[in-house]
Amino acid sequence: MMKSRTFRLSVSTLVGALVGVLMAIVGVYVTHSTEEPHTSLHEMLHDAVPLDSNEREILELKEEEFTARRREIESRLRAANGKLAESIAKNPQWSPEVEEATREVERAAADLQRATLVHVFEMRAGLKPEHRAAYDRVLVDALKRGSQ
């Protein structure tokens, strides 16, 4: 009786964790579509700040660099998620293999978040000082909307 209950609890916990990881990955893909290189933050920046040609050129280069970096990290995230799925398929309970695969997913997701923030601040540095306040407002507004 106790073993069966413990097993059900373990499986339920594992399924819940897997659903959480999958939801996080879906969120990453929805917010970082590879088909559209410009994020909504990028578009809002163009609407809020009158960029000159030099700023546009600088930001476009930074955007291209970030797109390549983001794709590399997203590839690692997909691979890590695949490892997690394989680990669970081999042994559908919390195990050292599932733990390690979960940590790989977490590392890749954290790397993506960090790279995105570095990119945001690199973009800001590419603006004229008089345009940075408007950029900051757009950034803060976007983050606030995302947290609601």
UniProtKB/Swiss-Prot annotation:
Keyword NADP: no
Keyword DNA-binding attached: no
Transmembrane annotation, as ranges: none
Protein name, as recorded: Nickel-cobalt-cadmium resistance protein NccX
Keywords from the UniProt entry: Cadmium, Cadmium resistance, Cobalt, Nickel, Plasmid
Function: Component of the NCC cation-efflux system that confers resistance to nickel, cobalt and cadmium. May be involved in the regulation of NCC.
GO BP terms in the entry: response to cadmium ion
Sequence similarity: To A.eutrophus CnrR.
